[in-house]
A protein has these predicted regions:
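Intrinsically disordered, low-complexity Ser/Thr/Pro/Gly-rich regulatory segments
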Residues: 1-71, 76-196
Length: 196
């Protein structure tokens, strides 16, 4: 019987993701194609490892008042209880009530791209989200408060040295709610999360 090692398994997964992001960066000259390939790596990771109740897609988010977000590279949403509003040729529109997290995916991170990601996150958090009372055999549960939507950025590299140092912290703190980035991953260097 062989000895399993969880640290080795997870390290191998990280190496695979980092390698695939590096391949996307080095193989394609066209920025749009390079970006699409990088998004596909992140989407594949989430689609493989999230519980099946959740789904990750590139999409627009819409609210009950008909307002739309910007296009979001990676939207994590509840597929079990929320149907798509619209899905045509890969262009998806997802109801705001079903969104758990949104991420901008980039080849690299710098102050301008952090600001860009913050604006994308803000475009989702600005949407109206509704909730209805839930009837049950013994009466009615009151409507639930909408849960906070996580916002983040996913990238291969960073323009800063150190990648996750003070320059990044300053860029992250330049934008308050609703564009706040809660977490992110720079595959070649590590991850960050907002301290509560």
């Amino acid at each position: 019987m062989s000895n399993w090692n969880l640290a080795t398994i997870l390290s191998s997964l990280h190496t695979d993701i980092q390698g695939r992001l590096g391949l996307a960066r080095s193989s394609f000259a066209h920025p749009g194609v390079k970006g699409d390939a990088s998004e596909a790596v992140w989407l594949s990771l989430l689609q493989t490892y999230l519980p099946k109740r959740y789904q990750a897609e590139t999409a627009h988010v819409v609210d009950s008042e008909g307002k739309f977000s910007d296009q979001i590279d990676v939207v994590v949403f509840d597929r079990q209880y929320s149907p798509f509003i619209f899905d045509f040729q890969g262009q998806k529109v997802i109801p705001a009530e079903s969104v758990y997290a949104v991420f901008e995916a980039k080849q690299t991170v710098d102050a301008a791209l952090i600001s860009y990601a913050q604006a994308k996150v803000a475009s989702v958090r600005a949407l109206s989200r509704t909730s209805l009372p839930i009837p049950h055999a013994g009466g009615v549960y009151k409507a639930k408060e909408p849960f906070p939507i996580l916002g983040g950025i996913l990238s291969f590299e960073s323009e800063w040295a150190p990648a996750l140092g003070p320059s990044m912290e300053r860029a992250l703190s330049d934008y308050a709610d609703p564009g706040r980035l809660d977490l992110g991953c720079i595959a070649a260097h590590g991850h960050f999360n907002r301290k509560a």
